[in-house]
Amino acid sequence: MKYTILICLMLQTFFVISQKKNQPKVINSQEKLEKMIADLSKANESQVINWRRHLHQYPELSNREFKTMAYIAENLKGLDVTIETGMAHTGVVAVLNTGKPGPVIGLRADMDGLPVYERVKLPFASKEETEYLGQKVGIMHACGHDSHVAILMGTAKILSAMKNDLKGKIVFVFQPAEEGAPKGEEGGAELMIKQGLIEKYGIEVMYGLHISSVTEVGTITYKPMGAMAAADQFSIKVKGKQTHGSRPWSGVDPIVVSAQIILGLQTIISRQTELTNEAAVITVGKITSGVRNNIIPEEAEMIGTIRTLDTTMQKIIHEKIKLTAEKIAESAGAKAEVDIKIGYPVTYNNPQLTAKMLPSLEKAAGENNVRVVKASTGAEDFSFYAQKVPGLFFFLGGKPKNVDTIDASQHHTPDFFIDESGFILGMKALAQLVIDTK
């Protein structure tokens, strides 16, 4: 009898186990949203690539992104968003209001191109030209802002389709002039904030990404706290004494003095700055002087950039630039006038927000495809948003897998190139951050 009971119990257990195996897996609401994001990202990939190629072919410079603004607004019209154009001259702000209580999340993409002739042989390569600082130049999306816009448009399409499953508001910020407004004009993130972007829309947290031509497609890199450098501009005007080119001893040559100053500036970094703390850079990007081969001119002027990742270091380097230029000029009988303009602050990733949202990036890319990197000496005006609300800015891999990092094209060059297969991850990451922000 007891054997009969035992056999019955075994059969019953086997039946229950087999029934469980045959039952479909129950998907919770979070898994459902993640699957929707993955499916919609894949479904919208070709559209996003087409958007990017159009934008790449017709780039516009800072504060002149009128066609770009119209293109973005036109392609957002079919979505369940309200659209404002013209903020900070040519910006676009689209709001997805779910109608349910929840966080107000800002997602930002920059829009402007650069005065660069494109050298990459693409069927959608830029052929745009314009006048810039008195000379004819090409216009190119040589920093990937076309990719950022297309990815954010795709993210807006995905989240609009998921509206019934979301809470709060999502503010899609298409920002002009990240590369810097023309001389005498305001622009970029600073102007958007000045015009009330954060307060008007009630933004509580801000996310942004930047495509990278030197990190592998399918990866995400980030750094907590100081992620990108502060960028300041300087000009040094050297006043000498004009004379005949054959008689330099009868004048004071501002070109030679300028050369000595340029070398002196580099010793500020290599010999006077504790680089074990943070990186720093001083670069002279332009020097102008003279009109003829046989005239030693009266003046020379140089302009350049300063990159720092620490406010104390920033202050010290500013002081040393002034002291170095003035004393070198004085030693040669010349005079140096130094002007330093404060630019973008350090791009600061809120450490609490970064730690909290890291799992979201890992869900999107896979845990092994997300890694911490050292700070970049590049600069970003996303930093202004991160001064107002907690922010997280990360890098999206865009380097083809078959290209070595050393051979990858650099940003701001005629050869800049992006692997478009990385756009899916960009959309997934931004959308995942939205659904995980509570």
What are these regions (language model features)?
Residues 25-29, 78, 259-438:
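Metal-dependent amide/peptide-bond hydrolase catalytic core
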Residues 1-23:
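Bacterial Sec-dependent N-terminal signal peptides
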Residues 32, 43, 47-50, 54, ...:
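Extracytoplasmic/secreted proteins, especially bacterial periplasmic and envelope-associated proteins
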Residues 129-140, 146-147, 158-286, 291-295:
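Histidine/acidic-residue-rich, glycine-tolerant segments that coordinate divalent metal ions
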Residues 55, 94, 107, 145, ...:
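Divalent metal-coordination and catalytic microenvironments
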Residues 19-140, 150-167:
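Acidic/His- and Gly-rich active-site-bordering loop/insert found
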